[in-house]
């Protein structure tokens, strides 16, 4: 129950890794009923659409009706995040966030490589910031080293 988290002192709800807007709409509504901020994250595919097939324009239409406090793209490779953000950012005038993963899921486990080391990830994050993302972090495969690099750069 979200009420339990709110009663325990949660200050926001981050609902993440949605593949379509209907499931996100339910989550936002639940948070709003508790008068809590709702941060919502969607998973983009390589063409910038959600895994469920919706375009970013369709996401914006649905989210404009529901008003999340921050709209994120997450749990996808950096290239997919970029593709989604390039489509989303021009359409959304409220806070945007991103956090990519730097591995590949090969069931039953994740495989992490040096394809996106902390420095390369920082370069992607700079680009995302230039596109309009103001809340930036890391998902699966990122480590404290990645977040330290982000903190050092963005706190200058």
Model-found features: residue ranges?
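Domain-level signal for soluble alpha/beta catalytic cores
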Residues: 1-156
């Amino acid at each position: 129950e979200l009420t339990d988290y709110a009663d325990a002192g949660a200050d926001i709800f981050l609902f993440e890794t949605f593949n379509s807007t209907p499931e996100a709409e339910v989550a936002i509504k639940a948070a709003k009923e508790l008068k809590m901020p709702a941060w919502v994250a969607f998973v983009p595919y390589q063409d910038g659409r959600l895994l469920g097939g919706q375009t970013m324009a369709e996401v914006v239409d649905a989210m404009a009706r529901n008003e999340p406090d921050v709209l994120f793209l997450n749990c996808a490779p950096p290239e997919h995040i970029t593709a989604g953000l390039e489509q989303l950012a021009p359409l959304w005038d409220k806070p945007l966030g991103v956090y990519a993963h730097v591995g590949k899921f090969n069931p039953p486990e994740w495989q992490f490589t040096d394809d996106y080391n902390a420095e390369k990830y920082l370069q992607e994050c700079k680009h995302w910031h230039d596109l309009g993302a103001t809340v930036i972090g890391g998902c699966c495969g990122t480590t404290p080293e990645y977040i330290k690099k982000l903190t050092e750069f963005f706190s200058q």
